[in-house]
């Protein structure tokens, strides 16, 4: 049976967790007539979640599946056209579902922010997924759709204008309201550092800027590409004169997703494409101090974590960190916002700015982004790329998302500056 003829168009796996419930709420508010099912380990908890989602979700079927029982994942994959998964940490729980979807030719989207999970998915299942026609799309939340879509938008705009390929390209997180992390986010960062610190090869790979590329030997030598740096805004773009920027904690992951997008599309952005991410720390007299402090703290914390985290007792950490399935309150999420600006200079000297902004917090936005990724994969198949295998959001469905996301309150734009 082809994936388009299957019982469900979308299965949301992990529907009872924090991110899963938010994604379910978003899908239930979108009157799409899509055939949607909720999946997880407990039918009782699934039923309780469904009861809270409103009338459009009242007849959504429930599917029992468990990451520790691969046969249940395989059966779920054969029934679905698309599976959205919020079950993490993905390094610990994710590969069996990737395997099931690659085998069944089922499209897949997740919320991973874990480099080694991405690398293992590519190494183990890219070829099989390409052969069966599956799109295994990584990082479909705040990690890394704003980063990936902004660059894709710039690429499309420069190509339309005939102004050459992208060269120096920098994302600046201009505003961000998030104060609290969910239990799932904490578990994800912990698992990523535990993996890097317990395996010398993993440590080497997470420090390679082209960890996720299709062919490491084909990548150009663009010199050092540090993950963390403090920079004057004017060094990134004239429009940022007076500002200071510092390290962005998600930069090491997002940058590698964006570079994979370039490689998957046969380096369509260009072989001179050089990409970095920072966050704005304002333009006050204290901004340079804040830039140095934030950059040092993030670089030092992640650097030490990637080396030594595995030495920390896991149970002790679990007692003092948020539990998986928990997250910020609804009031906190509704007060949230973020704005990402990506500046590029093309090989002909043309300059552009892409903006990606959402007037909700990163968790509420992630639910929208994952939900719309699922709807794009299921319903917008004529807008998807021809690529198959282990993909990125931009490489799989960049044009579909650029068309779809503005319907949900996400602001996307690409403007020529010079």
UniProtKB/Swiss-Prot annotation:
Write the Enzyme Commission number(s) for this entry.
1.3.1.-
Entry's Gene3D superfamilies? NAD(P)-binding Rossmann-like Domain
Broad enzyme group: oxidoreductase
Disulfide-linked positions: none
Gene Ontology biological-process annotations: glycolipid biosynthetic process
Gene Ontology terms, MF aspect: oxidoreductase activity
Q: Name one Pfam family in it.
A: Sacchrp_dh_NADP
The answer on whether this UniProt entry bears the keyword Lipid metabolism reads: yes
UniProt keyword list = Lipid biosynthesis, Lipid metabolism, Oxidoreductase
Give the top-rank taxon of the lineage listed in the UniProt record for this protein: Bacteria
Q: Which GO terms describe its cellular component?
A: plasma membrane
Question: Which ranges form a coiled coil?
Answer: none
| Family indicated by similarity | Belongs to the saccharopine dehydrogenase family. Enoyl reductase subfamily.
Any idea what this protein is called?
Trans-acting enoyl reductase
């Amino acid at each position: 049976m082809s994936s388009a003829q299957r019982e469900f168009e979308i299965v949301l796996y992990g529907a009872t967790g924090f991110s899963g419930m938010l994604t379910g709420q978003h899908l239930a508010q979108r009157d799409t007539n899509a055939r949607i099912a909720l999946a997880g380990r407990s039918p009782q908890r699934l039923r309780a979640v469904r009861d809270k989602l409103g009338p459009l979700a009242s007849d959504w079927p429930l599917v029992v599946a468990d990451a520790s029982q691969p046969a249940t994942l395989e059966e779920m994959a054969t029934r679905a056209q698309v599976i959205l998964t919020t079950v993490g940490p993905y390094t610990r729980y994710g590969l069996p579902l990737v395997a099931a979807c690659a085998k069944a030719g089922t499209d897949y989207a997740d919320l991973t922010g874990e480099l080694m999970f991405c690398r293992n998915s590519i190494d183990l299942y890219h070829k099989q997924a390409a052969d069966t026609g599956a799109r295994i799309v990584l990082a479909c939340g705040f990690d890394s759709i704003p980063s990936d879509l902004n660059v894709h938008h710039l690429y499309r705009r420069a190509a339309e204008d005939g102004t050459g390929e992208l060269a120096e390209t920098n994302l600046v997180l201009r505003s961000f309201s998030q104060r609290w992390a969910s239990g799932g986010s904490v578990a994800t960062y912990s698992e990523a550092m535990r993996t890097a610190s317990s395996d010398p090869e993993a440590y080497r790979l997470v420090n390679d800027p082209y960890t996720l590329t299709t062919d490491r030997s084909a990548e150009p030598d663009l010199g050092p590409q540090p993950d963390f740096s403090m920079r004057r805004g004017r060094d990134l773009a004239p429009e940022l004169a007076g500002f200071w920027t510092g390290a962005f904690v998600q930069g090491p992951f997002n940058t590698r997703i964006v570079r994979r997008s370039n490689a998957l599309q046969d380096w369509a952005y260009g072989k001179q494409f050089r990409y970095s991410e920072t966050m704005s720390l304002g333009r006050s007299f204290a901004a340079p101090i804040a830039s140095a402090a934030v950059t040092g703290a993030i670089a030092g914390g992640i650097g030490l974590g990637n080396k030594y985290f595995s030495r920390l007792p896991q149970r002790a950490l679990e007692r003092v960190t948020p539990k998986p399935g928990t997250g910020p309150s609804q009031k906190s999420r509704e007060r949230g916002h973020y704005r990402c600006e990506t500046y590029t200079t093309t090989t002909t000297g043309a300059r552009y700015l892409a903006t990606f902004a959402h007037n909700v917090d990163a968790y509420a936005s992630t639910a929208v982004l994952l939900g719309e990724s699922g709807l794009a994969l299921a319903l917008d198949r004529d807008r998807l790329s021809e690529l198959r295998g282990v993909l990125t959001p931009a490489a799989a469905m960049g044009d579909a998302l650029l068309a779809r996301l503005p319907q949900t309150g996400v602001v996307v734009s690409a403007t020529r500056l010079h």
